[in-house]
């Protein structure tokens, strides 16, 4: 999306408002089992690593048991509403409500009424595939006079990138490692910090 109107507007806002910075701190939440081998499919609602650490919340594996969690609140960094995650043999799904990210000093917040991601394994030997949805999403920069909120795409293409000074916001982030596809609804990185919201993972499964 480099060079698009969204990036040009945000770039201007950053120049006026000054550099951005993530707020430090630390947090631990309900996590995936330590040292466990990743199952073929899995999902979790939110995680972060850096000065602020949030272990995967509402993690679920291939057993198909849905996991839910109440609001996640890290003052000055991120808050969410309810979280629902599901993982079955051939698909995974994550949904996070009422997302508000306060990880910028001059950009007030990135928010969305809901962020979700899903991935599926092909039944015919093809690669896994997935998608993400962002409902009511926007980025707000109140320190720039008369600067309107920038709406986020509801169904962004894979790896849609928005640059915010030293930070990078990736919508529908999709990566493949050793045959495993990881789909992250919203991924923010920069300044030694990252934040993942609505993560689904699908990998190779034995069909025998």
Task: Tell me what each language-model feature is.
Residues 1-36:
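Secretory targeting and sorting signals
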Residues 34-208:
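Extended, solvent-exposed, non-transmembrane regions
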């Amino acid at each position: 999306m480099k060079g698009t109107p969204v990036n040009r507007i945000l770039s201007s806002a950053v120049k006026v408002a000054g550099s951005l910075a993530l707020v430090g701190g630390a947090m631990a939440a309900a996590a995936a089992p330590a040292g466990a081998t990743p199952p073929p499919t899995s999902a979790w609602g939110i995680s972060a690593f850096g000065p602020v650490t949030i272990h995967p919340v509402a993690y679920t594996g291939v057993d198909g048991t849905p996991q839910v969690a109440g609001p996640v609140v890290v003052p000055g960094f991120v808050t969410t509403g309810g979280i629902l995650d599901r993982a079955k043999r051939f698909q995974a799904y994550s949904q996070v409500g009422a997302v508000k990210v306060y990880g910028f000093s001059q950009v007030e917040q990135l928010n969305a009424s809901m962020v979700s991601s899903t991935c599926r394994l092909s039944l015919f030997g093809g690669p896994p595939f997935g998608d993400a949805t962002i409902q009511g999403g926007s980025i707000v920069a109140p320190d720039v006079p008369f600067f309107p909120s920038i709406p986020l795409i509801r169904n962004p293409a894979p790896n849609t990138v928005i640059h915010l000074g030293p930070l990078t916001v990736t919508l529908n982030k999709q990566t493949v490692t050793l045959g495993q596809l990881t789909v992250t609804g919203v991924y923010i990185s920069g300044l030694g910090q990252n934040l993942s919201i609505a993560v689904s993972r699908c990998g190779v499964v034995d069909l025998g």
